Amino acid sequence: MAEQESLEFGKADFVLMDTVSMPEFMANLRLRFEKGRIYTFIGEVVVSVNPYKLLNIYGRDTIEQYKGRELYERPPHLFAIADAAYKAMKRRSKDTCIVISGESGAGKTEASKYIMQYIAAITNPSQRAEVERVKNMLLKSNCVLEAFGNAKTNRNDNSSRFGKYMDINFDFKGDPIGGHINNYLLEKSRVIVQQPGERSFHSFYQLLQGGSEQMLRSLHLQKSLSSYNYIHVGAQLKSSINDAAEFRVVADAMKVIGFKPEEIQTVYKILAAILHLGNLKFVVDGDTPLIENGKVVSIIAELLSTKTDMVEKALLYRTVATGRDIIDKQHTEQEASYGRDAFAKAIYERLFCWIVTRINDIIEVKNYDTTIHGKNTVIGVLDIYGFEIFDNNSFEQFCINYCNEKLQQLFIQLVLKQEQEEYQREGIPWKHIDYFNNQIIVDLVEQQHKGIIAILDDACMNVGKVTDEMFLEALNSKLGKHAHFSSRKLCASDKILEFDRDFRIRHYAGDVVYSVIGFIDKNKDTLFQDFKRLMYNSSNPVLKNMWPEGKLSITEVTKRPLTAATLFKNSMIALVDNLASKEPYYVRCIKPNDKKSPQIFDDERCRHQVEYLGLLENVRVRRAGFAFRQTYEKFLHRYKMISEFTWPNHDLPSDKEAVKKLIERCGFQDDVAYGKTKIFIRTPRTLFTLEELRAQMLIRIVLFLQKVWRGTLARMRYKRTKAALTIIRYYRRYKVKSYIHEVARRFHGVKTMRDYGKHVKWPSPPKVLRRFEEALQTIFNRWRASQLIKSIPASDLPQVRAKVAAVEMLKGQRADLGLQRAWEGNYLASKPDTPQTSGTFVPVANELKRKDKYMNVLFSCHVRKVNRFSKVEDRAIFVTDRHLYKMDPTKQYKVMKTIPLYNLTGLSVSNGKDQLVVFHTKDNKDLIVCLFSKQPTHESRIGELVGVLVNHFKSEKRHLQVNVTNPVQCSLHGKKCTVSVETRLNQPQPDFTKNRSGFILSVPGN
């Protein structure tokens, strides 16, 4: 369990108070405010007191403390209510909403921003790029809407002057995928006039203070706020908002959201055009109205991308259609000023609505298919203007306070009235708790035919000139007996009210005196059609799209539009219906004082808000009531896995009996009540424990399902693999048979062919038979060789084998192997080769045979050798099957050196036509010689020497390494050296010479 607050901070939940009374409630609220604890629970309702200072309780660490936690686990916080709404939406796939209410300056807008920040922070753990993009745009939209819809008032430096309801759409995983914003009743009159101590919308000041010099020049603006009539009232006011810095923030946010550069530029042009409109002055020359500063008209025309004469005409004249006739009616100075102001208000309102629509176009959910992506759920966040009581309350305050009456009625219906009625319907023992039901005030305003809005609409539709005083008279006549309505005519002794001007409504939040001045005009919301046509004909496509009705013909008769009050009433009814369809969570904001001080807690001011918000009644209902209720069927569907009596299905008489069994199994029977169709759970702790038990069981269920599914998958994979292996086996057998049949077909009758099938092409074998094919080809080649050998005399076979060995070792590396001649081998005994000494050699050879017991002579030949001392001499070599003898032919073939063949490790020859050969020995005493023949001269015998030696070594199952290089590497008594071969003209015979790296064998050139 997470750490809870100590008692020094008071009660974290008003439900835990010892006695439910206003003094104790206020004492606890004050204590927590003074201790810096601005949030307190009433069950699942959060009471928030505006601290009027920045608190370090909204960072990432705090977010992590509340993420996934239940309400009772952490101290009260906005994050707790946001997480509760998110979990309810995700767990039960149910739409939820967070309703933030309270009077102006109580901190509603900041609360909505922190809630949005929290939801953005806890979603999209997998960091999907598209979800991050949506989250970023949802957050950035806040500062854009604040810039164009918020203003400094006497009660709040960042007061929302419009209502905002945002739906955030989530996919089945709980990640935001889009959203939609509804805006309500922008206070557009603030564009042209503000009360003392207040400012117009932030956007004007941000543009003038944050725009670059170049930008302001292009818009024909200057930084001086007092230069513009529409905003000069608040020019000298100090604000906690840094307009220049906010301008850059808003500009960046618009880019991030997806506004195009030309769209952003159009926004600045519209703001500049409004400021210039306010500086227009009208004079009358006789009966003709004129614009005193005509240059400003040209600037406005340039900014609005239209023609100067068209702007001037729309400001000074009104086009009237009477039947088929069209006339231009001149304005009086007063009418021209009225038209100018109406135009400025309308432009700004259209701009604001266009910004909202543009944001919606970008953030709305696109291409979402519930069959593929699962159910799309919603969390709604309502941030709407709070209850307002000013020194001068007009039509805007009337609408705003009506909105708050509707929201209070929703709270009463859902939290107080419906809850008590449900207990009675379900047969739950209950003691009724009294509360003030403000439905009577809601009806006073919105009732059909009898309410104030209906009376106002009737007055606006009357033929002839209707004044605000006539409207007040109609109110007195029709509502004179209403308990919550009064005026000076109805109560002559009440001197607070002015005759023919004021009326009072007793709102749930207190009495408010309204001045009827401007009610008729603001309700009609009149804007001459000339201005609409002017804007529709703009060459700027953004402006053109803002005024679609401007395309109507002058003579076209249109239906009377709904009045501003009726439009607002309809939007409020739709909003309340929307909120009622969702599971609501409430944040009740309280303003501690009127001085915006973080140190002052005004008891009377706060008590009044606690009373009209019905917070004490909320505590009583909460203490006596139940935190959660659910139908037996749905409850069982969610929690049946907790008990063995209900999992997977129960066999009890009814769902109610099954739920009872489940609750008793968990030991919660003292904390629940059983209604006719629903179970009621008193404390959140029980519900949270049920959720924990369910989460634990879900892990086991998921593991079981995973085990079963893995087994199923394994069996399926085994069957598929077994089938595949069977197919592979039969296919391989088929390929093998096909290959063997094809080989048999192609090589059929090769024995009768002249070349024994040498030209027959082998078929391509399957992969599995590649090694078999190699073996088969080897067998075939041996058979073919045996067939060829049969025709060779037995005496020639050793020579053939030697030639084959030579080819294997030297083919492709030496040009001439001597294959075309007969290989005699023992050339020293041959008279043609050594006619004078052959007779001398034979006795020596016989003596060596007797002495060394050799069986066969492999090779003998005259050579020229070089030793380590660079001495070059003519010698002879005599190779038997046991030894290599170096002999001196000048001394009757005396044996100079004997090398056993087992001591021979390899041969090295060059890659040319020379006869160089190096015999490598184990003791690194290599023998370097160059073969030569006397008859015929320059006969190549290297191939023969290599062939007979390799063939002999092979017969003894030994390997003789043969190297073909140039230069040739050798070792003379352990000293490494090289022998390179050079061809020289006029060289009579091969000869060795010394060089730096070893020796050079010079051979005769052609």
Curated annotation (Swiss-Prot):
Protein's UniProt keywords contain RNA-binding: no
Positions bound to ATP: 102-109
UniProt KW keywords: Acetylation, Actin-binding, ATP-binding, Calmodulin-binding, Cell projection, Cytoplasm, Endosome, Motor protein, Myosin, Nucleotide-binding, Phosphoprotein, Protein transport, Repeat, Transport
Xref: InterPro entries: IQ_motif_EF-hand-BS, Kinesin_motor_dom_sf, Myosin_head_motor_dom-like, Myosin_TH1, MYSc_Myo1, P-loop_NTPase
Tissue-level expression: Expressed in many tissues. Highest levels in brain, followed by lung and ovary; expression is lowest in spleen.
Residues with the N-acetylalanine modification: 2
Entry keyword annotation includes Nucleotide-binding: yes
Entry-annotated residues carrying Phosphoserine: 200
Cellular component terms per the entry's GO annotation: actin cytoskeleton; apical dendrite; axolemma; axon; basolateral plasma membrane; brush border; cell cortex; cytoplasm
Main location: cytoplasm
Alphabetical list of SMART domains matching this protein: IQ, MYSc
Record-annotated Myosin motor domain positions: 9-695
Domain of life assignment: Eukaryota
UniProt region (Actin-binding), positions on chain: 572-594
Cellular localization per UniProt: Cytoplasm; Perikaryon; Cell projection, Dendrite; Early endosome
Residue numbers of Phosphotyrosine PTMs: 536
All residue ranges annotated as the IQ domain in the record: 699-719, 721-741
Any Gene Ontology biological process: endocytosis
Family: Belongs to the TRAFAC class myosin-kinesin ATPase superfamily. Myosin family.
Function (record text): Unconventional myosin that functions as actin-based motor protein with ATPase activity. Plays a role in endosomal protein trafficking, and especially in the transfer of cargo proteins from early to recycling endosomes. Required for normal planar cell polarity in ciliated tracheal cells, for normal rotational polarity of cilia, and for coordinated, unidirectional ciliary movement in the trachea. Required for normal, polarized cilia organization in brain ependymal epithelial cells.
Subunit structure, as described in the record: Interacts (via the two IQ motifs) with calmodulin. Binds an additional calmodulin chain via a third, C-terminal region. Interacts with F-actin.
Record's comment describing the protein's domains: Binds a calmodulin chain via each of the two IQ domains. IQ domain 1 mediates interaction with calmodulin both in the presence and in the absence of Ca(2+). IQ domain 2 mediates interaction with calmodulin in the presence of Ca(2+).
Protein name stated in the entry: Unconventional myosin-Id
Biological source species: Homo sapiens (Human)
This protein's encoding gene: MYO1D
